[in-house]
Amino acid sequence: MNSTAANVKPEPGLYGPDAAASPAIARYLIQGPSPLSIGLVVLIGAISSFLLQQFLKPAVNPLSPKFTSNTWPWLGSLGMMIGHWTFWKSCIKESKTGQFSFWLGRTHVVGLSGPDARKMFFEHPALDLHKATDLTPLGVNFWPIHAIFTPRDEKFQKSTYWLRTLTHLMKTPNMERCLPGVIQDARTGLEALKRDTPSGIINTPKVWPVVFKQTARVFMADDVTDDPKLWATTLGAIDTILHTFSPFNTLLPWIPEPSMIRRRMARRALLRVSRGIVRDRHASPKSASKNDAVQSLINLGDPDDNISEFMINAAFVGVVNAHVIFPQLLNALAVHLDWQDKVYKEVTEVADQHCKEQCLPLVDKLFHIPLSAWENSFPNAALMMEEISRIWTCFPTARFNTLYESIPIPGTSEVIPARTHAIYNSTEIHFNPKLYDRPASFRPDRFAPESQKTWDKEPHGLNTWGTGQRLCSGMRWAKLQQNILMAVALSLYRLEKCDKDGKPDPSAYEKQQAMDGDLDEEVAFVLPECFVKLIPRE
């Protein structure tokens, strides 16, 4: 034995019977652990339990469709968030039934495909749209779901404040009230394009503020559209919500991710605007005579909180598709000059029919067109809008099974489990060659009255304006808006397709015949650049 080691003695008071001689240990033995150390242990334990809960997947119904292999650890199916159509096709390819399961974070989702499952998805009354908004990156800004989306009676899903108010604002007197203002909004915004861009070369997705100003006038208040300060705040907030995205908003919503923080702040800014307007209206005796959307709801005696929430939700929902459709209509009109000429001819004929002062510029004549003519006198514009909507409304749509029991998936032995999300991708129908001849081609005449409705070969073969249990409640305004925007644009300009330098784009027509080249967004929630040259009309 090493003699040096053998001669080493333990330090008194630290080991053995002399341990109590250490003052620190003695205090610990007598007093117990400090509150700080207990707190740290509890905090670490709580964080560990929370993380464990977040990363462990809950049990699922064994009759659920088989899970896809396209899955990342912890995150789930990231492909669904960054390339939805590529992901969808790969999942269907490896599924024996065409149905599949996948994870978004800890959320179990059932993916559906095929005519029978599609019919069930769109028609089953227990599959709720609003309760599935936590699943979509655009919907999480408005979570938890406000009471305006809750039915007064579970048996009548359409008995919500949201739908009742939309129906009220879609009535003819309200549409007629808004008509002069929204025509002027379109004129002011589109005339400014040439003033702000002397070359006349515009990137069409950048014109969306014109679309939003009209939407704000219809669903919010004249204060928003007419007050520069309120307009700037509201426009900036909507811009953030529309164009700020991260897949983690849905996959790991508990992480304070920067884009989520910006979106939450934007939503709060919208609430401050809407609540401030409602508060000011109550404070001013003269407000009762105002004639806009918010005042009509106040005059009906609606609760202030409901009005404020409706304003910001309607402003967002009203622009989310419209700000995509109009830029693509401008592009299509610039590429297909034959269709541009058809729509322009409609505009001039309708304007001349309703305006007695023939010496006025065409854009001034538009103010004389009555609501009924705006809605019914532009058949070629309607065909273009339907075709653009078919092409550009290709995305996953979510529902939530509100039942505490499973819903069988027709034609399979599989189910959508109780309290579980389901998703259907409308790209499956809108680019289906069985339903549409040459679906990747821009062909508005496929929707002409004399054409065969090939999409009726299968249930719900067209989903441009909703279908089944969920039709677009704001469809009347949406169609009217696009007619007005096209008419004002063509009354001011002739449109020519070009590149970013203003040179003619020789491949533009070919691109319009192969619009299925990439059905996944290049950048999520950001439209690809699309340049058009504005040539002022004489």
From Swiss-Prot:
<dbReference type="Pfam" id="PF00067">
    <property type="entry name" value="p450"/>
</dbReference>
<keyword id="KW-0560">Oxidoreductase</keyword>
<keyword id="KW-0472">Membrane</keyword>
<dbReference type="InterPro" id="IPR001128">
    <property type="entry name" value="Cyt_P450"/>
</dbReference>
<keyword id="KW-0812">Transmembrane</keyword>
<keyword id="KW-0503">Monooxygenase</keyword>
<feature type="glycosylation site" description="N-linked (GlcNAc...) asparagine">
    <location>
        <position position="306"/>
    </location>
</feature>
<dbReference type="InterPro" id="IPR002401">
    <property type="entry name" value="Cyt_P450_E_grp-I"/>
</dbReference>
<feature type="transmembrane region" description="Helical">
    <location>
        <begin position="36"/>
        <end position="56"/>
    </location>
</feature>
<comment type="similarity">
    <text>Belongs to the cytochrome P450 family.</text>
</comment>
<keyword id="KW-0325">Glycoprotein</keyword>
<comment type="pathway">
    <text>Pigment biosynthesis.</text>
</comment>
<dbReference type="GO" id="GO:0016705">
    <property type="term" value="F:oxidoreductase activity, acting on paired donors, with incorporation or reduction of molecular oxygen"/>
</dbReference>
<keyword id="KW-1133">Transmembrane helix</keyword>
<keyword id="KW-0408">Iron</keyword>
<feature type="binding site" description="axial binding residue">
    <location>
        <position position="472"/>
    </location>
    <ligand>
        <name>heme</name>
    </ligand>
</feature>
<dbReference type="GO" id="GO:0016125">
    <property type="term" value="P:sterol metabolic process"/>
</dbReference>
<dbReference type="InterPro" id="IPR036396">
    <property type="entry name" value="Cyt_P450_sf"/>
</dbReference>
<dbReference type="GO" id="GO:0016020">
    <property type="term" value="C:membrane"/>
</dbReference>
<dbReference type="GO" id="GO:0005506">
    <property type="term" value="F:iron ion binding"/>
</dbReference>
<feature type="glycosylation site" description="N-linked (GlcNAc...) asparagine">
    <location>
        <position position="425"/>
    </location>
</feature>
<keyword id="KW-0479">Metal-binding</keyword>
<dbReference type="GO" id="GO:0020037">
    <property type="term" value="F:heme binding"/>
</dbReference>
<keyword id="KW-0349">Heme</keyword>
<comment type="function">
    <text>Cytochrome P450 monooxygenase; part of the gene cluster that mediates the biosynthesis of the bianthraquinone cladofulvin, a conidial pigment not required for virulence but that plays a role in fitness and resistance to environmental stresses including UV light and low-temperature stress. The pathway begins with the synthesis of atrochrysone thioester by the polyketide synthase (PKS) claG. The atrochrysone carboxyl ACP thioesterase claF then breaks the thioester bond and releases the atrochrysone carboxylic acid from claG.</text>
</comment>
<protein>
    <recommendedName>
        <fullName>Cytochrome P450 monooxygenase claM</fullName>
        <ecNumber>1.14.13.-</ecNumber>
    </recommendedName>
</protein>
<dbReference type="GO" id="GO:0004497">
    <property type="term" value="F:monooxygenase activity"/>
</dbReference>
